[in-house]
Amino acid sequence: MINLNEPYDVYVATEVGDISNGGVSKWVDDWVKNVASHLIVKPVLIIEIEQDDGWVEYVKQFVDVIHRPGSSWEYEYTMSQLPIANYFSLPDRKAVDMVIKGARKFHLLSYPLPIMMYGNSKDWSTEKMRKIYKRKIDSVCIHSLESETLKYQQKFRKFTKKSLGYQQKSIDFQNTLIKDGEVSIWIGLDNEKQFDFMIPNVYKFEHNLNAVDSNVVGFPARCEPRKNLHFLQNINSVAFTSEVTFRNIFDDYKKKVKFNNIEIDEYRVDRIEDFYKRTDWGISHSCFENEPFGYSIFQSIDFGKIPILHKNWCKDMEYPFRATTQKQFEKQVAEISKLSIEDRNTYLNNLRSYLSKYTSVEKWRDELLSIYNQDGDQIWLPTDISPSKSV
């Protein structure tokens, strides 16, 4: 338990470590590893979790639960293996609200989706959701725009009027947090003008494997409409994703979706590398709509898989295998299938060369620290001998 009487800053996320749904957890893990240790004011990580029985039981697998009957801090849910103080918003908000209230500064590392989900279940207004954080927001990092993600899925899926209203609330809530943040940060590759800073994610190519001699298509991503999983209906493929979501997500699609030859490899964060090391797939379905960064794209390239990219992803990069429709995607699979291993390796090397601009962990770290370690006009970075000003 932290000393609430000493100065500390709060950083809020929704995923970390084994509690993972995708790219946000990877970003937070990198933040904990590379940024947290260089913060000049003690950091406290808050993990927002949906407060229902299912989530409580899920999270209990990975955290320590400390019970102090009769105390003001009765329950403490924490992941002890993390190198910084951390607390989960379970079994209720009492503990984390107390920590947030006493913080010197308050930063959002990602969009707090669980608050929106809980608020919608209670039919809260956007204004009431915002009041969960009864304080100034010093910075907010955005990993994807709800306005783009939700509007895209509305093209494919049928929703009730009530559900569409909830989605609009999510768009409005995210926009409110961006507007209220003293500093807003976009983590994507392409510039979004509504943000104060553009600090793209980082991925360091460490494997640089040769191309895999297989024409099976791999899908290493979540089952959500903008990932365009339905492009694989007629393709020999394997998907590293949630089987439960896969079995249910297409029920309300406007057009029938039927897969002829797809294997589902159940997603687990501890099996990510194992999936990429499989040699029975060599083409990566990386054709995602509105993809801000795309860890799975970088990972596919790192592990020797030829990606099929969306036409709008990293548009300045010359690359022939791109698509926006299922028909175009199938055509690109056929084109890649004709390539020799030598040609595939040439494409992979060119991709790695261009994307190397996003591999500097130190640059990424220092750009974030220039925000978190700022006090007035003074900033301390790890290259300095000592903090420029005591805070």
Say what each PLM segment does.
Residues 10-13, 203-227, 233-239:
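Conserved donor-binding/catalytic core segment of Leloir-type glycosyltransferases
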Residues 14-29, 225-227:
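A short, glycine/small-residue-rich beta-strand->loop->alpha-helix junction that serves as a flexible
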Residues 26, 338-389:
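A charged, aromatic-enriched C-terminal amphipathic alpha-helix characteristic of glycosyltransferases
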Residues 70-73, 251, 259-276:
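Conserved active-site histidine-acidic residue motif and adjacent donor-binding/catalytic loop
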Residues 112-114, 146-148, 167-172, 187-208:
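Short beta-strand->alpha-helix junction loop in the catalytic core
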Residues 284-296, 311-319:
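Nucleotide-sugar-dependent
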Residues 302-310:
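Short hydrophobic beta-strand element within catalytic cores of glycosyltransferases
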